[in-house]
Amino acid sequence: MSFVAHPNIDPKSLGKVGVLLGGRSAEREISLMSGNGVLAALQSRGVDAHGFDPGLQSVAELAAAGFDRVFIALHGRYGEDGTIQGLLEQLGVPYTGSGVLASAMAMDKQATKRLWMTYGLATPRFAMLHADTDFDAVAADLGLPLIVKPAREGSSIGLTKVTAADQMRAAFEKAAALDNDVIAETFIDGAELTCPIVGEGDSAEALPVIRIVAPEANYDYQNKYFTDDTQYLCPSGLDPEVEREVRALAVQSYRVLGCRGWARADLMLRADGKPFLLEMNTSPGMTGHSLVPMAARAVGISYEDFVMQVVAAATLDLHPNEHWKPE
């Protein structure tokens, strides 16, 4: 499925659309920003769109809402990890983005990295941390600096760049307060990149790469969403051959995970020009600071046109006719 600048989508053909926003995760605030942007875009195109907050409203209310499809603008736990996707499968309501398994896999950084490694895709070396881990040994094995973060959070929440072995325990405890699974990975010194992908299977394609230049190379939660100090370069300014390699790696990583609809791969480009995959976001941000709309604009696709195409592609792991129905 190719995304185009001016899609011919009849808003009435989309039916009643629910925009799931807010939720219960640590990224609730960002989800509200994304969801409200998506809701406004759909309504501006004449779509019968309604916001729905699973953090405040019940499953029974969702089932009774009568949505013909939903746009998942939830981020993090319960919205990006296969949970809401499984519920929507049960309800038979088509939804945007990846299915249950791909969402769950992509949310778990350990599972994602192990799968990528199995397919020979470059990702930083890592180790799982526990309270009784020999932190000095991990630091010696992975090398310093290294990154410690929760295995199942996004938006850099709970992340620490460790520059000395004696910082490891504090970094672990910070991440462990958010997730039982904590990961340490080798720090890749180089350019921070992100690359959106749209479509499914062989039709999946990458949008332009964005190069991120953050203050003091610190692209944290604050710099991602609440300051204007971070520079986003699109076109990326990379050598064209390097850009092609990054885009190809992003698409390959998306296909390996079984993603569909849309997602965003985050990468690092080492000083020698080798790209490394960091993680896959299956429900990317759609705020005023978000990167997917920026990449879309670079190829002439407006925010509204992009949203319309994402929601038009809403589907289920199973075709609706394959869902069990009582006699």
Swiss-Prot record:
Requisite cofactors: Mg(2+); Mn(2+)
Coiled coil: none
Cofactor binding: number and manner: Binds 2 magnesium or manganese ions per subunit.
Keyword DNA repair appears in the UniProt entry: no
Gene: ddl
One Pfam family hit: Dala_Dala_lig_C
Enzyme Commission numbers on file: 6.3.2.4
UniProt-annotated binding residues for Mg(2+) 2: E279, N281
Function, as annotated: Cell wall formation.
Family designation: Belongs to the D-alanine--D-alanine ligase family.
Compartments, record wording: Cytoplasm
Ligand binding (ATP): 139-194
Location, primary (coarse class): cytoplasm
Positions that bind Mg(2+) 1: D266, E279
GO MF: ATP binding; D-alanine-D-alanine ligase activity; metal ion binding
Keywords assigned: ATP-binding, Cell shape, Cell wall biogenesis/degradation, Cytoplasm, Ligase, Magnesium, Manganese, Metal-binding, Nucleotide-binding, Peptidoglycan synthesis
Cross-referenced InterPro entries: ATP-grasp (IPR011761), ATP_grasp_subdomain_1 (IPR013815), D-Ala_lig_Van_CS (IPR000291), D_ala_D_ala (IPR005905), Dala_Dala_lig_C (IPR011095), Dala_Dala_lig_N (IPR011127), PreATP-grasp_dom_sf (IPR016185)
Protein name: D-alanine--D-alanine ligase
Span of domain ATP-grasp: 113-312
GO cellular component, one term: cytosol
